[in-house]
Amino acid sequence: RECVTINRATDEGEQTRIGDHNLLMAYCHLGHNCLLGNGIVMSNGIQVAGHVLIEDKAVIGGCLGIHQFVQIGGMAMVGGMTRVDRDVPPYCLVEGHPGRERALNRVGLRRRGLDRRDQGQEIKQLQDVWALLYRSDHVIAEGLRLAREQPLMPLADHLCSFLEGSISQGRRGPMPAVGGR
């Protein structure tokens, strides 16, 4: 769209990459070395710092900044004017200043056809794992350990893998939940 700026990668052999079927609305900026998946919607005035990864089908509200090295998971939804200074897990709804994990993005999952009867067990497991990670007394690392004690279907497995990477050394960590955990 109009007035979008995209910076190229900073070093030889690196890249700034934008996938297919994305919508970057007016006055968005992508910093160097950003990697965008497919089917992403970025509303007006989003400022993305360098080395940011945004997975497929994320929806990002307008007038916000995304800190460098942050990752935004697939099918996540970030509310407008949210301060995004930590990783946003897939399938989650984040909003606020500072940004906080609010809930699963159930509307986004439904819009992607992931609420069909044949996927009911997978959505139920995703909800249970999310509740274990964000609504129990466990810290994220302990919740991940407990979640991995059972066989995980693809959605819950992706959520856990994303969070395991997010809490690894040298990363910014996941967005905290409402209540500050």
Walk through the language-model features, giving the residues of each.
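Structural signal for interior beta-strand "rungs" in well-ordered beta-sheet cores
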Residues: R1-R100
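Terminal amphipathic alpha-helical/low-complexity segments used for targeting or macromolecular assembly
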Residues: Y91, H97-R181
